[in-house]
Amino acid sequence: MIIAFQNALDLAAELEGIGPVAQIEERVFPDGEVLVRLPEARGEVAVVARLYPAVNDNLIKLFLTIDALNDAGASKIILVIPYMPYARQDRRFRPGEPISSKTVLKLLAHLNVFGIITVDLHKGYVAEYAPRLVIKNLYPAEEFAKALGGVDVVLSPDFGSVHRAEAVARLLQVPYTYFEKYRDRSTGAITLIPRQDVDLRNKRVAIVDDILSTGGTLVDACKAAKTLGAAEVYAAITHCQLLKDARERVRSCVDKIICTDTVLNEFAEVRIGRLIRRELEALL
């Protein structure tokens, strides 16, 4: 059986056929507390949930949902969480900080979750923080490649996304490259230094990355690519949050924005339902 948060019913509909689909009732009380009410669900159950935005409220709803499923006698619980919140806090950056991604995964493991299907974790090694969980970290390289037909070069804005650029470029059969990022220790200013392995002059360039939040990284990479002679710059981003004035900032440079629907947004050209369906069928 598949049960879904209201904000993920569209995604759950793409999974129909694996099992019956039902909606989780959700309520927010005047004092801010939340409550869920589940349809009758036993046996193997998949919970489909977009946890962004309102990540903290949605995480509590998810914890309550899982606990209610355990009380109801579910034999296996699979979570479909397209965008995993707190994934960017993947290590302890300063003394005294938690590793927030590990905390979330540990809580889910303690709640007797069997597995999680997610899309494009910020760092893949986050999955190792919860060895008891079966974690499927998917990347829509094929879907991006189809949307980026005609591109000449795939570009990562920094070394951290090189594996994404390589995966898409391999399918497109075009070269890929990345910018080396340097931060001035006194001013904090970031400079992007291009590698010399790929010529961007008069090329259609696709920048791939996992998250578009304020747009700063993407716009800097776009400007650098156009300074190097790129004719057009596209962006293929997995999780498009588009915070503050990100839309206007990105549109000021990027010629086309392509996002997935892991987070609901106006540029969600790539749907990830088919990708998730394949993995869910294997787990249930």
From Swiss-Prot:
* Subcellular locations according to the entry: Cytoplasm
What does the entry's cofactor note say about binding and number?
Binds 2 Mg(2+) ions per subunit.
Instruction: State the superkingdom.
Output: Archaea
Q: Which Gene3D superfamilies match?
A: 3.40.50.2020
User: Which terms in the GO cellular component ontology are assigned?
Assistant: cytoplasm; ribose phosphate diphosphokinase complex
The catalytic activity, as recorded, is: D-ribose 5-phosphate + ATP = 5-phospho-alpha-D-ribose 1-diphosphate + AMP + H(+)
Name any cofactors this protein relies on: Mg(2+)
Q: Tell me the gene name.
A: prs
Query: What CDD domains does UniProt report for this protein, alphabetically?
Result: PRTases_typeI
EC number assigned by the record: 2.7.6.1
Q: Per its record, what are the GO molecular function terms?
A: ATP binding; kinase activity; magnesium ion binding; ribose phosphate diphosphokinase activity
For the ligand (Mg(2+) 2), the binding residues are D158
Q: Which family does the similarity line name? A: Belongs to the ribose-phosphate pyrophosphokinase family. Class III (archaeal) subfamily.
Query: Which parts of the sequence bind ATP?
Result: D31, G32, E33, R88, Q89
Q: Where does D-ribose 5-phosphate bind?
A: R183, D209, S213, T214, G215, G216, T217
Q: Which organism is it from?
A: Pyrobaculum aerophilum (strain ATCC 51768 / DSM 7523 / JCM 9630 / CIP 104966 / NBRC 100827 / IM2)
Q: Which SMART domains match?
A: Pribosyltran_N (SM01400)
Name it.
Ribose-phosphate pyrophosphokinase
Q: Which GO BP annotation is one of this protein's?
A: 5-phosphoribose 1-diphosphate biosynthetic process
| Main function | Involved in the biosynthesis of the central metabolite phospho-alpha-D-ribosyl-1-pyrophosphate (PRPP) via the transfer of pyrophosphoryl group from ATP to 1-hydroxyl of ribose-5-phosphate (Rib-5-P).
InterPro entries per UniProt: Pribosyltran_N, PRibTrfase_dom, PRTase-like, Rib-P_diPkinase, Rib-P_diPkinase_arc
